[in-house]
UniProtKB/Swiss-Prot annotation:
UniProt lineage: Eukaryota, Fungi, Dikarya, Basidiomycota, Agaricomycotina
Reactions listed under catalytic activity: a 5'-end NAD(+)-phospho-ribonucleoside in mRNA + H2O = a 5'-end phospho-ribonucleoside in mRNA + NAD(+) + H(+); a 5'-end (N(7)-methyl 5'-triphosphoguanosine)-ribonucleoside-ribonucleotide in mRNA + H2O = a (N(7)-methyl 5'-triphosphoguanosine)-nucleoside + a 5'-end phospho-ribonucleoside in mRNA + H(+); a 5'-end triphospho-ribonucleoside in mRNA + H2O = a 5'-end phospho-ribonucleoside in mRNA + diphosphate + H(+)
Entry note: cofactor: Divalent metal cation.
The protein, known as: Decapping nuclease RAI1
TM stretches of this protein: none
Any one annotated GO CC term: cytosol
An annotated Gene Ontology molecular function: mRNA 5'-diphosphatase activity
Residues the record lists as binding substrate: R34, E205, K227, Q251
Functional note: Decapping enzyme for NAD-capped RNAs: specifically hydrolyzes the nicotinamide adenine dinucleotide (NAD) cap from a subset of RNAs by removing the entire NAD moiety from the 5'-end of an NAD-capped RNA. The NAD-cap is present at the 5'-end of some RNAs and snoRNAs. In contrast to the canonical 5'-end N7 methylguanosine (m7G) cap, the NAD cap promotes mRNA decay. Also acts as a non-canonical decapping enzyme that removes the entire cap structure of m7G capped or incompletely capped RNAs.
Gene Ontology BP terms: mRNA processing; NAD-cap decapping; nuclear-transcribed mRNA catabolic process
Broad class of where this protein is predominantly found: nucleus
Cofactor entry: a divalent metal cation
Entry keyword set: Hydrolase, Metal-binding, mRNA processing, Nuclease, Nucleotide-binding, Nucleus, RNA-binding
Family the entry assigns: Belongs to the DXO/Dom3Z family.
């Protein structure tokens, strides 16, 4: 097994792979306790935030979720929930991951500052991909973010001012306030898609839907993303915003969300204006500039290149391929005394060097997680041992 494999950069002249329109297969909610409920309990309804609202509202009352590593738990639990009820889950031969991982892959050609690493393992015909986030990196990021804590909070406050929760607005806050921020609460969509010939199964948080409060889930066509940005005052601000639109487009395009609403605030956190963008048209807004800062074609080539790279190298190390007799064979596992180990891979990106994949080695069950990633009971179910 090769230790390290560099990823060749895609040729801009190569054909642009097609990104298949996402198909919604499941939704689930994180409740105020962070527990998962397989329904739309945390789905919120869009209601435009009042211009002039203060996005520092409720900062001292916010509830932040514990910094615990959840890996791919919500996504894989959803797949098990679907399949055990006779519904379709992922398509084999592809990648199962969070929307945030694919956002990093699709924007990679234009990332000039931040390196990252991801962990990949193969199981039951799919590559599971998540961020490799060691404790020292988490601590460093937390220190850096503490200086911008209030600015980061403004995005959550904008969501509160822009949405009506299932239980309605509290009634004791300022105009439009949807309730104090609790970052435990999230509503997520799980979709099937594909980049070229490679199947994708993606989950990601969705901010709200465009529908009458109290009405049922309208599906992907009614989903919306909410973002904040500083008021654009000069060409430098405008150039920065056009670069920011790359991430806004990628996040929404990958999950099939048709609209992005951006609230523009001043330095004091006062909302001055807001604009709705059609996700599919965002690339054209940038394309017409004299010097476009990014191209969706290069992004799609990048995504396909990395996904192809991963499936080609990681899928053959699936233990159900290398140890086919294990599937459904409880006796063999009992005699071995443990599950066959996962072959763990690390995908590393450095803006100056590019991307490479290297094999970390075989990892069994560590603290209840196979390969350090997937819960043991989920792996046993996938292997037909439950």
């Amino acid at each position: 097994m090769p230790y390290s494999i560099p990823l060749l950069r895609p040729n801009p002249a190569d054909p642009v792979p097609f990104y298949r329109l996402p198909h919604l297969i499941h939704t689930y909610s994180h409740l105020p306790t962070r527990a998962i409920s397989h329904d739309d309990a945390s789905m919120a309804y869009y209601s435009p935030a009042p211009i002039g609202c203060n996005l520092t509202e409720g900062f001292e009352r916010r509830i932040e979720r514990e910094d615990e590593e959840e890996h791919l738990d919500g996504l894989v639990e959803s797949l098990e929930w679907l399949i055990t009820r006779g519904r379709k889950g992922e398509r084999k031969g592809g990648i199962i991951t969070w929307r945030g991982m694919l956002t990093r892959l699709i924007t990679m050609p234009y990332e000039t500052r931040d390196p990252w690493e991801m962990t990949a393992i193969a199981l039951d015909g799919s590559v599971y991909l998540e961020l490799w986030d060691p404790p020292e990196e988490k601590a460093k990021r937390k220190r850096e973010q503490s200086a911008w804590e209030k600015q980061g909070y403004m995005g959550y406050a904008y969501e509160s001012f822009s949405t009506i929760p299932q239980e309605g607005r509290p009634g004791n806050g300022p105009e439009g306030w949807g309730g104090d921020v609790n970052t435990n609460v999230q509503w997520a969509n799980v979709v099937r898609s594909a980049i070229g010939e490679i199947p994708l199964c993606i989950a990601g948080e969705v901010d709200c839907v465009k529908a009458e409060p109290g009405s049922p889930n309208p599906g992907l066509s009614g989903c919306m993303e909410l973002k904040t940005n500083k008021v654009i005052q000069h060409p430098g601000h405008e150039a920065m915003f056009h670069k920011k639109l790359l991430k806004h487009w990628a996040q929404s395009w990958l999950l099939g969300i048709p609209e992005v609403v951006v609230g523009f605030r001043d330095d004091d956190g006062i909302l001055r204006s807001q604009t709705t963008f059609d996700t599919a048209k965002i690339p054209y807004l940038v394309e017409v500039l004299n010097k476009p800062s990014w191209s969706p074609n290069r992004c799609l080539q990048s995504l396909h290149s990395v996904c192809s790279f991963l499936t080609k190298n990681v899928l053959p190390t699936d233990p159900l391929v290398t140890y086919p007799h294990i599937r459904g064979n409880r006796q063999a596992v009992k005699e071995a005394g443990e599950l066959p180990p996962a072959v763990v891979w690390r995908l590393a990106f450095d803006p100056k060097k590019g991307c490479e994949l290297h094999a970390v080695g075989e990892v069994g069950v560590v603290d209840g997680r196979w390969g350090g990633m997937l819960k043991e009971e989920y792996v046993r179910w996938r292997m037909g041992l439950e």
